[in-house]
Structures are given as C-alpha cells and as structure tokens.
C-alpha cells in the first residue's frame, strides 16, 4: 500500500490557466476559495431551487428542493470533515498524512462536493433519468450491439447501425449506443462543470464529485473488486479524455475514487434519510405519531440502550414532553436529526480513518455507512420506511409518472432534430434557419446557446473526412438534446411540455 500523503491528492492546479509555482498554505486556501465562488455563483446551483427532492412541482416552500437538500448535505459534510481532522489531530496524524497545512482545503473540497452532488440531476429525478434512457433505448437498442447476424440489429439510426466488414467502426457504434442509453445524474454533473459550464475547477474539487467510476459505455460485468464503486455510470465518452487526465493529476488508478468523495456520499446518505421523512409529514402523507409507529414497527424488538432507543425513542419522548412550547412535529424532527447526526457522524469519521489505506488508494469498495453496524441499520430503517410509506404513496407515484411522461414527451417533440441528415443538420447549425425545415429551425432556436456552443466546439475538433465523423457527430447531437432537457427545472420542463403540446398558450 502506498504511503498516505494528501499533498499528492489535494491538487490545486486547474485544467486551464492554472496557478504556477509552489504555494503557501494561505495561497492554496485562496485557490479553493475561488472554487467556492465559482460553484456558489453558478447557474447550475441556482437551478436546484426549482428541482425537488421527492415531491415534484411542489409549491410548499417548507418542502425541500434540491438546493436546500444540498445545503443540508454541505453542512453534514463539513461536520464529518471536521470530525475526521479533529480525530487525526488527536492521533498526531495530520503531519504524517500531509494534512497539517491542508485542513482548510480538505474541508472546502468536501463542502463544495456536497453542494454540487445533485447538479447533474434531470427534472423529476430518477424518473427523469429513466425517461431519457428508455427513450434512447427504444431507438438505439444497445442490447443488439452483439447481434449475429448484424442484420438483426434493430437500431433505427443509420449511422449507428452495425455493418458487415466495419469492425473498428462497429466497436465505436456499440460504445456510443451504450453511452447514450446510460444517462446518469452524476455523470452529467461532471459534464456540466467541465464541458458545459467550463468552470475550470481545481482537479481535487472535480475529483470530489466523481462518485462512480464506471464509464457509461461499459458493457458486461464489473470487476468484483470495484463492483460498488462501479455501481452506476460516472462519466460519458465525451469526457473520457478529461477523466483520464483527472486520474493522472490525482494519482488515481483505473476505476478508483478520490478519497474525499466517501465523505460527500456519507453526508448525502445521512441527510436525505431524515429529510424525506420530514417532508412526508409536511405533505401530510402521515403524522409524526404514525411515522414513529412505522419506525418502531420496522425496527422491531429492542433493548433500552439500543441505537433505536437512543435516537428515535429519545426524540419521540423529548418532543412529547416539550409539546406545549413548540409543535410536536418541529420538536421531533429537531431531536431526531440531532440524535442521528450525533451517532452517525462520529461513526462515519471513524470508518474513514479505520479504512484510510484503501480509501486513500481509492479502492475501498463500500460506502462508509454500509456495513453490519447498528448505524447502518438505522439508515436502512429510515430508507425502508420512506420506500414503503412515502415513495409508494399514490400522490408521489402520480407525480413521478407525470414527470416520466413530460420528459419522454419533450424528447419526442425534439426528435425531428435527430432525424435530420448530417448535412442538413450541419446547414441548420450554420444558418440557424433553413426554409425547408420550418419545424426543425424553430426547435433549434429553443435550444440553449450554451448547449449549442458545446455541440459546435465538440464537432469542430473532429476531422470531417474521418469515417468516424458521422458517428461522433450524431453522438454529440444526442448529447445536445440530453444536455438541454436534463438542464431544465421541474417547472420549466412541465410548462414547456404543456406549451409545445398546445395544452395551454
């Protein structure tokens, strides 16, 4: 196992216009303060205001949005980071691990990774993801990529259909089809900060949001040693070269994760479990009393000093005894959150320290809060109650189905842009209005300038006389559409769908 030295991981250089020379502790901290400013002031963070956590299109301001959730995750991430650094200081490990002058950047990277962790999520969350992937699968049929004979390939896009005698091109076709059918919020987050927003963050800060290490074009089984880290797609073909450079700059082996990402993940796990239950009470899906009984029933028999007793029962008893001064709801969730954090944050911090050799190497193939402990059981309890009583509620399911229909419908509305030939679409991009394509011209005008420029830049770098050019052009055209629709807020997607379907003016 390589020696642990965080100076080799907390890389303060940037992809473009990077600061040069050896920096003092204060100068390095200023570089990460610049990252904070770029992130907090970015439109991607502001759009989280109108993307909801569990309840799409929610008008009740007390129910969490992706932004308020991300701020809560940021606070928990800061708490865990401080706990880790405090324990390392007590053990006299800060200097040994190269952290004695990097505690500020350590905390800042964790905080900003937490704030950014949801920026790539499409409207309507996982149902938006599913809608995008299902729509593209129905047209690209990535499962036919190994079809024999090749004439069995059902792909409806001529440029991406497998052809006899074109094996090198066929392999690229397989990768592109697989990649486009695996849209994922975390991978889109990487694309946002690097390709679309061009935020030029430090290598370490981007490493903090590379949650999964599986390429989106991956086919087949993942290695047993990395099955958790490669559970979902982490980046797209379009960012392959950037991620290769990121790995080099952060000393990451293939399919390995940046150490501070485990802290961001733990902060998210702790935050959303309690938050989803609190939002459900705010939405009157169940009362606090009903929630307590759901939790009690799901946990089962327990001793007086058990974790359930110390966290959930304690919160319930305190909230009832103070019910005259404040509402039982507010009191219960305040105590539940405090009790949960007081148990889970120190546990997550200790797990990080205990497993630091594997975490530093990027190969720890688990979440910090997924093990055989009572702390892990407590998180599972919150998640299971939410799945059983919140996510399966008819109101929630109806909104999710509506969200799926909205995203599918928007993709269908913009499909004419994908149906144009390469030469016709190139003409449309150059002229912005082509008389013989009135519908396509108007659809193209609706696309965001930022996304259109990203497409133009990507395609302009390709050699137009290469046999691969039509494949890559179509790939980036699909990305253009995915970028535009996934970047919408819930409300904008809903309104746009209704307008374009002529439901309202």
UniProtKB/Swiss-Prot annotation:
Molecular function in Gene Ontology: dGTPase activity; magnesium ion binding
CDD domains found in the cross-reference section: HDc
HD domain ranges (all copies): 66-273
Keyword Hydrolase: yes
Signal peptide stretch: none
GO terms classed as biological process: dGTP catabolic process
Reactions catalysed, as given in the entry: dGTP + H2O = 2'-deoxyguanosine + triphosphate + H(+)
SMART domains: HDc (SM00471)
InterPro entries: dGTP_triP_hydro_central_sf, dGTPase, dGTPase-like, dNTPase_1, HD/PDEase_dom, HD_domain
Homology family: Belongs to the dGTPase family. Type 1 subfamily.
Quaternary structure annotation from Swiss-Prot or TrEMBL: Homotetramer.
NCBIfam families in the cross-refs: dGTP_triPase, PRK04926.1
Functional summary from the UniProt entry: dGTPase preferentially hydrolyzes dGTP over the other canonical NTPs.
UniProt protein name: Deoxyguanosinetriphosphate triphosphohydrolase
